[in-house]
Amino acid sequence: MAGYLPPKGYAPSPPPPYPVTPGYPEPALHPGPGQAPVPAQVPAPAPGFALFPSPGPVALGSAAPFLPLPGVPSGLEFLVQIDQILIHQKAERVETFLGWETCNRYELRSGAGQPLGQAAEESNCCARLCCGARRPLRVRLADPGDREVLRLLRPLHCGCSCCPCGLQEMEVQAPPGTTIGHVLQTWHPFLPKFSIQDADRQTVLRVVGPCWTCGCGTDTNFEVKTRDESRSVGRISKQWGGLVREALTDADDFGLQFPLDLDVRVKAVLLGATFLIDYMFFEKRGGAGPSAVTS
């Protein structure tokens, strides 16, 4: 290179063994014979427009539903990975201030606080007025997307629950129209007991409550036991809501615990047992209020 002197002690580099091109030739505008065509140039974008626009904001929609799982009834996928359900009954103003019995409404969450859905009672005012806590009813449970995934049916059984002829029961359907189990009260002279049955009326678990269910200042626990009642595997707990709330309303909070690997159908039937226990022991009796209204 002209004008460049190598430092002392260094010999100039030998010429390379390959021919050196003095420079890149200018591209031909009109290729001649034997020349490859020159690709067309990409047009410059118009002012204000990007050549490669970035994707716009993603529209926020409803949460994606749970994927179907083999062997799990449609809609019960949310029960697979949880071992605890918290049930909060909403307090109705008409019921609080006037004493009129209305249809119950509930919110369901997992033990971690994740919303699982809502449940709403369906019954007529005549049944609430005349039958009170023993009224026949239907409870619809919907997921956060407002899709009905579980239905509870309670028929009218007259008589006292301490008498074998007046035992209460609840049918559990999932999806609605397909029976997956029953909750059947079993007679005992001192303790409230229930059988958790599958679709074939075979007992798989039992629920045993305390002799005195009106706990003041403490939670009321119903133990979920094995079929032979040899050990406890879960619990249905009616949580104490405070003196003012317990005195003025019948809006209750429940906690349901069960093994994580329990069949989802049995989990759903235990959920139905929780609602049946609420109506049997913690709901106003017939004639408690001056009237009943629809909600």
Swiss-Prot record:
A motif (SH3-binding 3) lies at residues 65-70. The keyword Endoplasmic reticulum does not apply. The modification Phosphothreonine is found at residue 21. It is a single-pass type II membrane protein. It catalyses: a cardiolipin(in) = a cardiolipin(out); a 1,2-diacyl-sn-glycero-3-phosphoethanolamine(in) = a 1,2-diacyl-sn-glycero-3-phosphoethanolamine(out); a 1,2-diacyl-sn-glycero-3-phosphocholine(in) = a 1,2-diacyl-sn-glycero-3-phosphocholine(out); a 1,2-diacyl-sn-glycero-3-phospho-L-serine(in) = a 1,2-diacyl-sn-glycero-3-phospho-L-serine(out). Keywords: Apoptosis, Calcium, Lipid transport, Lipoprotein, Membrane, Mitochondrion, Mitochondrion inner membrane, Nucleus, Palmitate, Phosphoprotein, Repeat, SH3-binding, Transmembrane, Transmembrane helix, Transport. One of its GO terms (molecular function) is SH3 domain binding. Its main location: mitochondrion. A motif (SH3-binding 1) lies at residues 7-15. Residues 1-265 are mitochondrial intermembrane. The chain crosses the membrane at residues 266-282. The N-terminal proline-rich domain (PRD) is required for phospholipid scramblase activity. This is Phospholipid scramblase 3. It comes from Homo sapiens. The gene is PLSCR3.
